[in-house]
Structure formats: C-alpha cells, structure tokens
C-alpha cells in the first residue's frame, strides 16, 4: 500500500457527522441488514473509536470499535464495493492496529458471518484466529446466521 500512498492521497481520519451520508450508502450497498443512521450517530456521540478511510477525498471505508481496558472490539468494518480486493481493508486494519496499541490494547476481536468469505480471508491473512461462535447472531433471510468470533493479539 505504501506505493499507492505515494500516488494517491490516503487518509485515515476521525469519523465526523458529515461522513454519515457516504457511510450509509456503503452500509446499505454492503449489508442486507444495515446499521441505521442513528446507530452511526450514537457511536460518534458516545465516543466509540470511529474512523474513515478517504482516498483522494472519496470515503472508501470505515471502522467502528469499542475500546475497553486492554481490548478492542471491531463492531463494524466495511469497504466500498468498487474498492474491495485492492488492499484498502488491509490498510484500514493495519492503521487501526497501529493506533490502538497506543491505547494499550492487547487483544482485538470481532464477529464475522461464516458466509462472508472475503472478510474471513482478510482477517485470517492479518493474523486473526477463530476463538468461538455466537449462535444465531446475525439476521438472515432464512432466520439467523451464526457469527464466528475472531481474535488477534496486537501487543504482547
């Protein structure tokens, strides 16, 4: 990504209210059961760790995390469809990992649908391991889908 960074203006910045319209577009285009505008605004208002990835001023991704003591829970991470499989998800994760180690976070965990093969592939390449399952966690057209719980140590 560093060679891309020299050519393109890539920014990892704090999520602001003015980003919400673009985030909602990505969210609705990516998920059958998207988060609402209120959820995103509540995350910003209640000091969740909310970041966006801008590429030449275009919002291409975002991540929302909860930081509690020495743990980081990734609650939502998404890359705009046309920008997937180009390294932006990896870049976003790596920036998050670097940043949270400054807050003494040692463990990062998240939930992922087993059906989200591309996300699972990214997380596993980035050192996440499956540590559990949450039964019937995600709404799905046929009822509910389990969630895989993935975790990574970012600081020993």
Task: Give residue spans per PLM region.
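Glycine-rich acetyl-CoA-binding "A-motif" of GNAT/NAT acetyltransferases
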Residues: 58-61, 118, 144
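Residues forming the Rossmann-fold NAD(P)(H) cofactor-binding site
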Residues: 90
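Conserved GNAT acetyl-CoA-binding A-motif
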Residues: 100-111, 122
